[in-house]
């Protein structure tokens, strides 16, 4: 069988058959078989394997080049090194920041403790100084703003004069209100205090006077209250009986003794010897806060002698004594008491009984003398005139011979 001759695809290269190339280095040109071998198809077409042969052996793979193996391993190691460096750096920074915050907190706490100790020591020193000042000045424990004050009544506040402000008239010296410090306007209604002539806004001074009784600028008093001192000039009715006794005053003489307060108290008791003592206490308070106490005592002596032994004391169960106006200054009381003791024996009462025409009427009259005592003291001369009124008794219809002696006297303590 004739062998077919293939047509050459590269005629230009086929003419150069005498040129051989060395293909032993493993690098062959695609046209090498046609140039190097006379039958290139024999080398390019793989021969068919025989049927008895086993599985085909794999062709050995060419060894990888150095660049293909070395370059990927270098990239992975560099990435691992970068990650580890970043991790270590972050951990170091975290440790440093934590230590810095701990140190800063420790120093801040120590500084606060030092400042607190210094502040407490300063406060203790200030408290000690203030306590020493309070002890030196003898101040009270309670602050002044805790003291409750009582002001004037609204009727008294409304009675204070209201005037219109005229600039330059000379009535009001200030041009502003001392309470609110606002300027007075022309023809504005102001309240003018009576004593000091200080002017205020009506709302300002009314609020002040509701809790105070003086001027807020000069502390002068606002209201002048005149109080009269009672003087006992009428008859005083005395009924023996111990605790059941009572005192009646029919007439009162008025005399101005104080500006703020005048109080009169009375007390009386019956002693064992039938002497009734009436004590009158009078308290006069001046405007400056001082108080003067005056004590007066009225003693009524009852003595009745019944030679027949009859019960004539019952007829004197009701005795009325008239006490005239008696005034004893404070420092002359002791002298008056001594004067009364000295003249007590000289004061006698005469009692006479007259029965006219055998009538059953009994008339007793008692004339008492007058006790005039003149005493001299440090403050001056004091004189007391004491007179007793007629002793009126209601006896029985039968004639009873009774000698009664009644002495009425007033002397101070």
UniProtKB/Swiss-Prot annotation:
Its EC number is 2.3.2.27. Disulfide bonds: none annotated. It is found in: Membrane. The chain crosses the membrane at residues 83-103. GO terms for biological process: protein ubiquitination. Keywords: Membrane, Metal-binding, Transferase, Transmembrane, Transmembrane helix, Ubl conjugation pathway, Zinc, Zinc-finger. It is a single-pass membrane protein. It catalyses: S-ubiquitinyl-[E2 ubiquitin-conjugating enzyme]-L-cysteine + [acceptor protein]-L-lysine = [E2 ubiquitin-conjugating enzyme]-L-cysteine + N(6)-ubiquitinyl-[acceptor protein]-L-lysine. A zinc finger (RING-type) spans 177-219. Pfam families: zf-RING_2. The keyword tRNA-binding does not apply. The RING-type zinc finger domain mediates binding to an E2 ubiquitin-conjugating enzyme. This is RING-H2 finger protein ATL54. It comes from Arabidopsis thaliana. The lineage of its organism: Eukaryota, Viridiplantae, Streptophyta, Embryophyta, Tracheophyta.
